Amino acid sequence: MKAAEIREKFLKFFESKGHTIVRSSSLVPGNDPTLMFTNSGMVQFKDVFLGTDRRPYTRATTAQRSVRAGGKHNDLENVGYTARHHTFFEMLGNFSFGDYFKHDAIRFAWELLTTVYMLPKDKLWVTVYQEDDEAYDIWAKEVGVPTERIIRIGDNKGARYASDNFWTMGDTGPCGPCTEIFYDHGPEVWGGPPGSPEEDGDRYIEIWNLVFMQFNRDAQGNMTRLPKPCVDTGMGLERLAAVLQHVHSNYEIDLFQNLIKAAARVTEVSDLNNNSLKVIADHIRACAFLIVDGVIPGNEGRGYVLRRIVRRAIRHGYKLGRKGAFFHKLVADLVAEMGAAYPELKEAEQRVTDVLRQEEERFFETIEHGMSILESALADLEAKGGKVLDGELAFKLHDTYGFPLDLTADVCRERGVTVDEPAFDDAMARQREQARAAGKFKAAQGLEYTGAKTTFHGYEEIAFDDAKVVALYVDGSAVTEVKAGQDAVVVLDHTPFYAESGGQVGDQGVLANASTRFAVADTLKVQADVIGHHGTLEQGTLKVGDVLRAEIDAQRRARTQRNHSATHLMHKALREVLGSHVQQKGSLVDADKTRFDFAHNAPLTDDEIRRVEQIVNDEILANAPGIVRVMPYDEAVKGGAMALFGEKYGDEVRVLDLGFSRELCGGTHVSRTGDIGLFKIVMEGGVAAGIRRVEAITGDNAVRYVQELDARVNEAAAALKAQPAELTQRIAQVQDQVKSLEKELAALKSKLASSQGDELAQQAVEVGGVHVLAATLDGADAKTLRETVDKLKDKLKSAAIVLAAVEGGKVSLIAGVTAEASKKVKAGELVNFVAQQVGGKGGGRPDMAQAGGTEPANLPAALAGVKGWVEARL
């Protein structure tokens, strides 16, 4: 039974038992930013189990795409070397949300395994929690499993309820016993039953885990029964397929065998048992599906995990002799295997291929040099009998050549060497500290402040009348007063000034009273809730305790707000036009523009840019209100607010609904979308592999831009004697005319060259039976020079010729040597002789070569020396 059929039978079986088939959720958990990747079937139902979400069904079944390759769930180093470790796997599961419980869950599992999949009953063993008499009795008395094949597992992990057969969601919350089903491969395979000293052998393989959530554990460890207990089960598709296909390694199942054969094809390797092929076959699944779900290779978070997996696959291809990109070629094979079950993979095939190819090409630029350094270091280490690689070297490979630490550790492990990881960590920490020190911004960074928090009024007000000075800083040190002309940082107890945060620049404005005026050039955070006003005291003396009117530059704030609100609309529009993989990677919002970096692997087309602009401007015309609400983080995310992975959020967050956009945001925004006025994209480009940048303008800036563009169009139309609407047609006509004139000019040059050729032939000097000619051909281009040389070679029969032309301060050179003469005089050497004297170089075939130079003043002397140079070689 093939893996695809096993998956299909599982889902159909539970559908027949009243379960709703729920499609696999994304590998990027939408409801849990603390989790790197979806690693089990229950992740998408976590809020249902916690009671904070309700679904229109009480029974569900899924085939969930899962990844374990980061954080605590990290199987990366074992992948390819063991029978059952994978970065990507499919978890088959059935779930009950307060509907059925142990009796039905156990009966369903037994029926599916023994009736649908036809597994022999006498091959199945089960474990239950030591105290779960109910599950034990169901297996023994209702299902009929012999008691000698039912094993009770107690608290075997050193604490109460710490057991292989007791599941917990965390320190508190839903928990309960579980029962596991094992398949016995028979006595010919080493290993003992669960709970025995030999349980780590391969004879008894766990295939299904049924979790019974029946308790809630509080902070004191007290257990209370849940009013509606739930069921969460998980069975690895790959493990089940290995059992049903009578093989002992997951890599021997049909799905993996097909991918291993594809990996062998693209790496040109014949040994299908090579572990590197297993690594590559496993990694293409994880990489492809992560990219499908919007993850792009990068240097942090999920993007870095993806980069590590890609580069590990590339390293194994390199180990097999591949010196160029190969990994991306497996995407089509993966689509053939899994595209029917997961249509999103087929839809994203080209994007996945492009992202992987770009990442490969980038790494292949450095892998050879990096591997050479690593191999040399390992050879030196082995010669000295050492077993630990210097952590500083591992960091150099990481920092300079893009080698993730686990890739270096992988190579070392194959040679029986470990990496000094503490030294690596120290080097990494030093670099981060240097970066942090270099990134300290102006005077507000690193100030020692122990006072009260600043109360921010800037969401509602542009001025605050009774702001009290609570701290002053000059050159990073606290002072009690500031004199006119000094730069300083002012901390107030209340302020309307927005401090730079979330990509939005800080406010500018004025702090003043009757005798004092302080010009604020920038506003930034001294601490999380303490705002510093950086600027210059223009008048008077400013002291701690003074009371000031704090007023922002309202016009600058308004322009900044327009750009910030437009950024939210643009983010949403980009996701609609390009796909849900678009994720913000950085932004800068100021009064002039918005700059937005996002994950996408290809330049935006003109049509895509127009569609984004149209969507945003439609939202502006709708004049929808901006609605701000403060709510618990979990509630905001559950309500669809976009949270950025890697951002730190408090328990309470600010949610902005603006038109069709909903995001978590602490910035300042327009009251209605119509306040943005007009939105125009003015730049699109790439900033890194898989990262694009868009710059856009709004409001009066956008109006001026369009007006200036219109003026330039009118000027161009006038110059071409056409109406603006006819400009494209008129330009096409002019281009046709230019092409026609260029053809005429080329014909004239050819004709001129032909006529000059006759004259030049008469200037040739015979040296040892070879006609030598070195001359300048005025007004000739490279093509004309070549044609003239060819004609002279035909005319002179035995010749060595150099022709030159000068245009725009640059020298063009062509050398031609006839077949007989080229036995002694090479055109490439001849042209280089002249080129070196005019500040250039060149090369070519023995009979024809070309060169260029930048010193035309030296050309006459260089040509004059050709005769002697040829004569010396005859």
From Swiss-Prot:
Any single biological process term in GO: alanyl-tRNA aminoacylation
Tell me one GO molecular function of this protein.
ATP binding
Q: What class of enzyme is it?
A: ligase
Write the Enzyme Commission number(s) for this entry: 6.1.1.7
Q: Which reaction does it catalyse?
A: tRNA(Ala) + L-alanine + ATP = L-alanyl-tRNA(Ala) + AMP + diphosphate
Which GO cellular component terms, listed alphabetically, does the Swiss-Prot or TrEMBL entry include? cytosol
Q: Does the keyword Ubl conjugation apply?
A: no
SMART domains on file: tRNA_SAD
Mind listing the UniProt keywords for this protein, alphabetically? Aminoacyl-tRNA synthetase, ATP-binding, Cytoplasm, Ligase, Metal-binding, Nucleotide-binding, Protein biosynthesis, RNA-binding, tRNA-binding, Zinc
Q: Could you give the cofactor binding note from the entry? A: Binds 1 zinc ion per subunit.
Signal sequence range = none
Q: Which residues bind Zn(2+)?
A: H564, H568, C665, H669
Q: Name the coenzymes or cofactors required.
A: Zn(2+)
- Location within or outside the cell: Cytoplasm
Entry keyword Lipid biosynthesis: no
**Predominant localisation class:** cytoplasm
Family to which the UniProt record says this protein belongs: Belongs to the class-II aminoacyl-tRNA synthetase family.
What this protein is reported to do is described as: Catalyzes the attachment of alanine to tRNA(Ala) in a two-step reaction: alanine is first activated by ATP to form Ala-AMP and then transferred to the acceptor end of tRNA(Ala). Also edits incorrectly charged Ser-tRNA(Ala) and Gly-tRNA(Ala) via its editing domain.
Record remark: domains: Consists of three domains; the N-terminal catalytic domain, the editing domain and the C-terminal C-Ala domain. The editing domain removes incorrectly charged amino acids, while the C-Ala domain, along with tRNA(Ala), serves as a bridge to cooperatively bring together the editing and aminoacylation centers thus stimulating deacylation of misacylated tRNAs.
Give the PANTHER family listed for this entry.
ALANINE--TRNA LIGASE, CYTOPLASMIC (PTHR11777:SF9), ALANYL-TRNA SYNTHETASE (PTHR11777)
In Swiss-Prot or TrEMBL terms, this protein is called Alanine--tRNA ligase
